[in-house]
Each structure stands twice: as structure tokens, then as C-alpha cells.
Amino acid sequence: RYHFTDKEKLFLDIFSRSEREECISMGGIIMDDAAYPREGVEKILQNMSREPRNEAERMKKNICSVLFQENMYVSPKNIQLVAETNQALSHIMTLYLEEGDYVIAEEPVVPDNASIFRNKGINLVTVPMEPDGMDLAKLETAIRKYAPKFIYTMPNYHNPTGIVMSLEKRKKLLELAGRYCIPIIEEDSQRDFRYEGNRLPSLYAQDRYRSVIYIDSFTLTFPYGIKTGYIVGPTDLIETLERLIVVDETFVSSLGQYILNEYI
């Protein structure tokens, strides 16, 4: 059995506020409807001359182009499409972890992600945040104590704290994970919420240990209903994931991928 903690109730309250028309909840990471590219999407739909099919490969190529602008050099063979980052995280857990394994994440963890770990019987160890990201001294202590299978992090605008991990700390995190041979799952779906300053390179872009699995989604920055996310990793991982989630891919929206392809 499990129970809802006070923090989980707080998150539920934050998200319920997002549904009220009179307020925009900054805590729920739900954009104001007016900020979505509604006119652009409507134009794409009006000009659609065929039923969208086989959009997945075009989607992967477009994602490669987007990531190239972030100094991430990947091919379509390094990409697996999913509906959203929660699904990506769940599939990675299914593939790599067994009940009783440990994963380290930044504190606090949003309830949706905490539920993924809990439902799979994974022990979640959290590390406190500092103004520039995860407390790396406490992270190393946790690594030595629990021997985790993964480190899960959101270096850009961590949900829910909004903290951005500094460039120096990103480099140290990669060195620390490399020293202990622990893979990193980097979720980067909030990276476009920057309003000032320069965008910092992702962990994946700086990774010389080939230890980072990168997950991202267009869900937060594109209208709801167009759910397309992706996993970036080594080709052997992607090939295994393809076999694992071939059934789920049947339900990925070709229309949503078509709209994204045209918009990108």
C-alpha cells in the first residue's frame, strides 16, 4: 500500500488551480493557452492535403535538426519516439531496473515521476537542491551508500523548483557519474522556458563518458493533445526500446507528428 504525502496533495492543488480560468498557475508548468502557436497550427491543418502517414522517420530527422542547434550530434538511429517524458522514463525503468533497485533524483520529485518509480518497486533516493543545482557532495554520499542504477536529473528549470544547474556543476556531475560508472537520465523538456541569458549546454552535449540518456517532449511547449516526446541514446539501447514499445507506438498520433513536422 502507499499513501499520499502532504507534498503530493500540494502538487494536486497546484495543478487543479491551473484549470481555473481566472488564474495562470506558475507551479503547474502549464502555459497560458494564448502562448501556444494556435494560428500556425490552424494554418497547417487547413493546408493539409493528405492523411498523415509514416511521419515517424520525418519526425526523427527533424528532431536531429533541432538537437543539432543545441550542439547535440545524433542520427535518427539514436532516437526513439514516445508520447511524453513520463512514458520515456517508464520504458527505461522497465528495460534496465528490477524491483528493489535504487535511483537517485533531485528533491523534490513531482508525483507523476515518483509514481513511476514506486509502481515498479524502485527505491527512490532524493538529493537536496542548491541554488545552482543538485548538492553534489550529498549525491556522492548517496552513491556510495546505495549504489544506484541511475541518476535522474532535470538540469534546466527543474520541476518544481525552477532551478537551472550551473555549467560548472554540470561538468562535475558528469565526472562524478563517470567515476562511479552510473548512467544519467537527463530530462530537458523545460529548456525553452529561458527568457534571459545564454542557454547552457545539455549534459548529453558535454558527455565524454557516453553515459547520458536524454529525454525530451514537445508537450509543454505545444498545444495539448499533440503528445510527442523522444529518447536519445546509443543505437543498441534504441533498438531494444523499439522492440519493447512497438505496441505503444501503434497509438502514437500520426496527425500530431505531422503537425509538429510541418511546424518545425
Q: Where is each model-derived feature located?
A:
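N-terminal small-domain helix-loop-helix segment of the aminotransferase-like
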Residues: 3-84
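Active-site donor-binding loop signature of nucleotide-sugar glycosyltransferases
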Residues: 28, 129, 205, 217, ...
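Short, solvent-exposed loop/turn segments at secondary-structure junctions
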Residues: 29-33, 86, 110, 156-158, ...
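Short aromatic-enriched loop/helix-cap "lid" or pocket-rim segments at secondary-structure transitions
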Residues: 36-40, 195-198, 225-227
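Conserved core of the PLP fold type I
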Residues: 48-181, 191-193, 198-206, 210
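PLP-dependent aminotransferase class I/II
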Residues: 213-264
